[in-house]
């Protein structure tokens, strides 16, 4: 939802800016970045349409963070070489949803980079729908949690997307950005730094 070995997380908020844009966040590990300090508390003023049924499970959240990963690897209690190797093969995916009520600094600390991208409400909605279709839903209904997440305010959900060595958490994040119409190249993306590099380029324009 980490970087290097951890992966890119998507942080969504439907809070409308005066200019009529919404905010989208990509998070990765690395040195502190000024973007973190600019991202103060956000007010979740309305549900994201694509994931409205899911967002309703996290009342009071300012931001929802999403991360994709290999189910067996994510749920493993200990780091085992067999589980790590298994993650390179096509395997069931898992999505971690984390509700953030504090500032991004309090939630992620200085070791994470936060890149702020201004997108239109329509683009944010498309990204939300991409996430919804990545969940293992039945007849479009709100999926039940697969299990509790690693921290307070987080839940795991089964994914309809399969994870493998050529489709990682970072590939998924890049595809989500692309679903919102952002010029992000998802094909061939495997590592977090690739997504973060493109996100920084977009943020600088």
Label each PLM-derived region with a short phrase.
Residues 12-13, 17-26, 30, 37-158:
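Non-catalytic ligand/cofactor/substrate-binding and regulatory segments of enzyme domains
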Residues 2-5, 133-205:
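Activation targets extended, charge/polar-rich intrinsically disordered C-terminal tails
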Residues 1-17:
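Membrane-interface motif at the C-terminal end of an N-terminal transmembrane signal
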């Amino acid at each position: 939802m980490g970087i290097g070995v951890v992966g890119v997380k998507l942080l969504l908020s439907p809070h409308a800016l005066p200019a009529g844009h919404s905010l989208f966040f990509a998070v990765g590990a690395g040195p502190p970045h000024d973007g973190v300090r600019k991202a103060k508390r956000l007010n979740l003023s309305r549900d994201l349409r694509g994931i409205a049924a899911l967002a309703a499970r996290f009342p009071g959240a300012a931001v929802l963070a999403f991360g994709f990963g290999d189910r067996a690897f994510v749920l493993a209690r200990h780091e085992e070489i067999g589980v790590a190797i298994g993650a390179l093969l096509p395997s069931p995916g898992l999505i971690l949803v984390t509700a953030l009520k504090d500032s991004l600094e309090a939630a992620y600390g200085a070791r994470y980079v936060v890149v702020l991208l201004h997108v239109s409400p329509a683009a944010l909605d498309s990204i939300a729908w991409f996430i919804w279709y990545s969940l293992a839903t039945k007849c479009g209904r709100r999926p039940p949690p697969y299990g509790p997440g690693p921290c307070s305010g987080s839940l795991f959900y089964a994914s309809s997307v399969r994870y493998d060595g050529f489709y990682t958490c970072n590939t998924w994040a890049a595809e989500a950005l692309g679903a919102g119409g952002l010029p992000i190249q998802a094909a061939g993306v495997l590592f977090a730094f690739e997504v973060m590099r493109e996100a920084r380029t977009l943020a600088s324009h």
